[in-house]
């Protein structure tokens, strides 16, 4: 309705634009941008409009923010993503993960992808607000939204939050392993809603969180089937066809399979060639990892490693960094176990090597939305009252 009204205004169809805006405000009476456009349309009966907010006596930063919101919303409608295209960062989503969220901070959009029979389909997208000073968080309090690969970590119902957060919140696991490597600080980055008297916020308005309109947060929650949903936050999405993604990922997949085969070989030096000099894991550097692997492999007569449910994402803004998660089934004559593993791989001179590996976070909470409230099915460890922070 909003984009249709803007098109009507551009074509000088004032009456048609009024009908669309009236319908919009009937559904969303707290939509401030809609009220601004309504005022402009009333003024247009007396004289031509020059800019949005022409009828406001004293234009200021608030009107500029509403103009910026209108521009971002109109751009999405006039420049939609190509049909069937995927974000540049998406190489593979695990078969057991139903959804993927991708935030394009430059266009103020959150895109929802659903895994349908092994094919990723874009099923929804929403306008969002990000940090007051943009994207690329580096330190606590810098009012920026982080750029990276994260996942939702549970949910917080509106009953446990102030009205500022609207219909609830989905915390993200910022800082991730790469953030910590870069000495980035801060915490409490959430996807959350808006106060009840506010339909949406300007494009740059939070302290770093990603903020959605309440109705759209509720729609998002109704789609998600678990709390551990991958979230990619990118400075700008470049859209590519799935076959282009598969071609770009082929070299990485060969490196991953070579790592698995070399681990099974029990040739520790061959296996260690897949680890970079800056490798770290759970307090061990490469030298300590080498000593550990030499000791444990010497005691084994066979090793078998299975990899399933693989997800691979290229890091936003860094074509030489990939984040991988998978279910690992390990068997030897002395040990058998299963785990969800996360690895960070870095490419140097065309060679992919591991700079971090460790256990991946397991889902803790299932979420659903009913009549404007997030319903939680939570582990006991997640029942403590959250520390309230504003963003």
Each language-model region and where it sits:
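Short beta-strand edge/turn micro-motifs at domain boundaries
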Residues: 336-375, 383, 387
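Short, well-ordered alpha-helical segments enriched in acidic and aromatic residues
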Residues: 265-278, 282
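Gly/Pro-biased beta-strand-loop elements
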Residues: 78-190, 194-200
């Amino acid at each position: 309705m909003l984009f249709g009204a803007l098109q009507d205004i551009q074509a000088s169809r004032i009456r048609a634009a009024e009908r669309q805006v009236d319908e919009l405000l009937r559904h969303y009476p707290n939509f401030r941008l809609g009220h601004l456009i309504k005022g402009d349309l009333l003024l247009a009966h007396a004289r031509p409009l020059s800019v949005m907010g022409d009828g406001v006596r004293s234009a200021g930063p608030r009107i500029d923010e509403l103009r910026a919101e209108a521009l971002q919303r109109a751009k999405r409608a006039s420049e939609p993503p190509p049909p069937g295209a995927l974000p540049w960062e998406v190489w593979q989503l695990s078969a057991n993960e139903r959804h993927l969220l991708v935030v394009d901070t430059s266009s103020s959009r959150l895109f929802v992808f659903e895994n349908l029979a092994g094919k990723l389909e874009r099923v929804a997208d929403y306008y969002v607000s990000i940090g007051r000073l943009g994207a690329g968080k580096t330190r606590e309090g810098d009012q920026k939204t982080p750029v990276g690969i994260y996942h939702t970590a549970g949910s917080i119902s509106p009953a446990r939050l102030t009205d500022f957060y609207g219909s609830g919140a989905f915390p993200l696991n910022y800082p991730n392993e790469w953030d910590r490597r870069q000495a980035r600080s801060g915490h409490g980055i959430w996807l959350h809603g808006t106060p009840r008297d506010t339909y949406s916020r300007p494009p740059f308005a939070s302290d770093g969180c990603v903020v959605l309109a309440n109705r759209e947060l509720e729609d998002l929650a109704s789609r998600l089937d678990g709390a551990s949903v991958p979230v990619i936050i990118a400075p700008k999405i470049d859209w590519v066809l799935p076959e282009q993604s598969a071609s770009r990922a082929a070299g990485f997949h060969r490196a991953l399979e070579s790592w698995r085969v070399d681990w099974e070989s029990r040739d520790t030096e061959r296996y260690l060639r897949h680890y970079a000099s800056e490798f770290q894991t759970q307090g061990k550097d490469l030298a300590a990892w080498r000593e550990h692997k030499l000791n444990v492999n010497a005691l084994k007569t066979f090793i078998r490693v299975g990899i399933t449910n693989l997800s691979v994402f290229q890091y936003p803004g860094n074509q030489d960094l990939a984040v991988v998660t998978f279910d690992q089934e390990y068997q030897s004559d002395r040990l058998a176990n299963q785990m969800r593993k996360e690895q960070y791989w870095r490419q140097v001179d065309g060679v992919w090597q591991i700079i971090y590996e460790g256990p991946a976070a397991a889902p803790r909470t299932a979420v659903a939305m009913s009549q404007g409230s997030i319903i939680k099915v939570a582990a006991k460890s997640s029942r403590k009252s959250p520390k309230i922070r504003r963003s």
